């Protein structure tokens, strides 16, 4: 009987090599994930403002359409300026009338001021005459008992004293009248200042009737048309600030240890995953609402965890500023993937 030849033992080297390569690949993946965190829980965002008129009125011109791009200084809409133009004309007419009244009153005051100076001199003269008449009467009355003067002399002294007092009172009234005329001009001048303030305010309202874009942006949520009455401080539409786009990426708290402001980032949008955008970390969130109870602080962003039956790391929003965004691709709320490259 012929013996069967023994099979050579199979080498274990290929299997060990595969296991070793798998371990190396696993270590590399773990290192890569730890050193260059990535997340697809991200979305595009930008700053927005509510475009509100600061004056009320009917919209007579609407220069934009919904989702239209605008440049800084472009006309957005115009409110009917006629009521404000009428108020301006009325205030300017009041100012002109006041100026004429002040001019005429000033002429009268100048004349009265000249008379007031004369009246002041007359007051002093009348005061001196009244004092002299009073002194004369005081000296004359005792002499009547001695017989040095007659009763008629005393009567004349009394009459002279009364006449001097009457003259003094008359010139004092004239002086008061002149002073009141001068103060009347001051009141008109104060009234003129109030009218000038009204004119300045009306001009400001007239300027506010024309609303222009404060920055480069895009119009959204436009739901009005020409003829609509716009109320002051009520939004007409929203304007996206397209000068600066950023991505809010929610990273696990275990990924944050090497992330700093200025950390380079790569962004891909779901609308075109083959195109990448460079950016830098602007800031890292310092508070979120916990979804498993505990202290709840109003105003904090809430980031839901992906599974509830396992204790997983919380995620915090990281704000990434995009260097050169594509204005046609970037939209608020668009899904994104963010990759960070900590130094």
Curated annotation (Swiss-Prot):
Q: Which InterPro entries does this one have?
A: CusB-like_dom_1 (IPR043602), CusB_D23 (IPR032317), MFP_Efflux_Pump (IPR050393), MFP_proteobact (IPR005694)
- Where does the sequence pass through the membrane? 13-33
Record-stated family = Belongs to the membrane fusion protein (MFP) (TC 8.A.1) family.
Task: Provide Periplasmic-side residue ranges.
Answer: 34-343
Gene Ontology CC, one term: plasma membrane
Q: Which organism is it from?
A: Escherichia coli O157:H7
Reply yes or no: does the keyword Signal apply.
no
- Name the UniProt record assigns to this protein: Multidrug resistance protein MdtN
Q: Which PANTHER family match?
A: MULTIDRUG RESISTANCE PROTEIN MDTN, P-HYDROXYBENZOIC ACID EFFLUX PUMP SUBUNIT AAEA-RELATED
């Amino acid at each position: 009987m012929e013996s069967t030849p023994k099979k050579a033992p199979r080498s274990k080297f290929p299997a060990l090599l595969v296991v070793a390569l798998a371990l190396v690949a696993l270590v590399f993946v773990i290192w890569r994930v730890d050193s260059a965190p990535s997340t697809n829980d991200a979305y595009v965002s930008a700053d927005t403002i509510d475009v509100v008129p600061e004056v009320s009125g009917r919209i007579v011109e609407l220069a934009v359409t919904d989702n239209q791009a605008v440049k800084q200084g472009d006309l957005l809409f115009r409110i009917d300026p006629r009521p404000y133009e009428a108020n301006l004309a009325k205030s300017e007419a009041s100012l002109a009338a006041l100026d004429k009244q002040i001019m005429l009153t000033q002429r009268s005051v100048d004349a009265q001021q000249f008379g007031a100076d004369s009246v002041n001199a007359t007051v002093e003269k009348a005061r001196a005459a009244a004092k002299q008449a009073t002194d004369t009467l005081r000296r004359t009355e005792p002499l009547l008992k001695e017989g040095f003067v007659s009763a008629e002399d005393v009567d004349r002294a009394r009459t002279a004293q009364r006449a001097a007092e009457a003259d003094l009172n008359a010139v004092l009234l004239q002086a008061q009248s002149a002073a009141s005329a001068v103060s009347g001009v001051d009141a008109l001048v104060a009234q003129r200042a109030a009218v000038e303030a009204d004119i300045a305010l009306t001009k400001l309202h007239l300027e506010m009737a024309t609303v222009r874009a404060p920055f480069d942006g895009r119009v959204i949520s436009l739901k009005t048309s020409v003829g609509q009455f716009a109320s002051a401080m009520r939004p007409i539409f929203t304007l996206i600030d397209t000068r600066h786009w950023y991505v809010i990426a929610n990273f696990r708290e275990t990924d944050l240890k090497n992330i700093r402001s200025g950390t380079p980032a790569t962004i891909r949008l779901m609308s075109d995953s083959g195109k990448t955008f460079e950016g830098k970390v602007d800031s890292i969130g310092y508070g979120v609402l916990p979804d498993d109870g505990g202290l709840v602080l109003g105003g904090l962003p809430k980031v839901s965890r992906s599974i509830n039956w396992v204790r997983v790391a919380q995620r915090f929003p990281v704000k990434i500023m995009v260097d050169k965004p594509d204005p046609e691709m970037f939209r608020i709320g668009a899904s994104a993937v963010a990759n960070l490259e900590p130094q």
